[in-house]
């Protein structure tokens, strides 16, 4: 990510998103487990959350879980009776996501 893009993303995250212990812990765990830092940003995660929520989704299928960061954002948008299914080909990634 370019410096300007990162600065804008950091600003949006600081002003609009606030702190979230579960998401922060997920990112730390992903790094500690050696996963590539290719998660969506917090702002992108919030956008996924809003899009899923606005669509009224009751079921979400995510292909490619990595460490589960975006999975958490998407799952939070579901109603109580919603269903989140995520698929991950790499065993290590799936184990880390399950921990998160």
Describe the predicted segments one by one:
Residues 1-23:
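N-terminal auxiliary segments of SAM/dcSAM-dependent transferases
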Residues 3, 38-100:
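S-adenosylmethionine/decaboxylated-SAM
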Residues 13-14, 34-36:
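Short, contiguous strand/loop micro-motifs
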Residues 30-31:
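N-terminal beta-alpha supersecondary unit
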